[in-house]
């Protein structure tokens, strides 16, 4: 599980030795985001270690800082929707072209047509690539396709440090349970 892995990575170091802890706070699976953020909050709180909240999509884009390109970070949000953000990678920096969003495959296709070449990466890259059907898309190689610790660290470099109490998950849409509850309330009103 997560805590034994953290202990193994830390080796002889203690949590109190850290200057900050970076975490991808979303978007992503509701459970995965909650577990990651809660774990970091728990680790950081006791020793008052600053936290850095990083977009999962930005962490993915940071895998390409050695190239000048457009990166389309995508995560499967189900029902042919994707969590997505676009980044221009230039001179070793990722410049955000749009905010993190939940987007349909058709809307994403329209957005991507204006670029000459786009590298598509993330856990939704293969599904997205297979359904876009446009020529300017390149599927990222497996070794750069997914988020990794290095990408999180690079994305966190110039971000604001916050307290563990201020660290919160970032969700781009309601969970299925929240959507169903909202629908039930709406049905009761009618």
List the predicted regions and their residue ranges.
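N-terminal beta-alpha supersecondary unit
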Residues: 1-27, 102, 143
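Residues at secondary-structure transition points
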Residues: 1-4, 30, 34, 38, ...
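Generic hydrophobic alpha-helical segments
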Residues: 2, 6-9, 60-61, 108-112, ...
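Stable alpha-helical structural segments in soluble proteins, enriched in small hydrophobic residues
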Residues: 9-13, 46, 64, 149-160
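Surface "functional belts" at beta-alpha junctions
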Residues: 50-146, 171, 176
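Acyltransferase
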Residues: 140-190
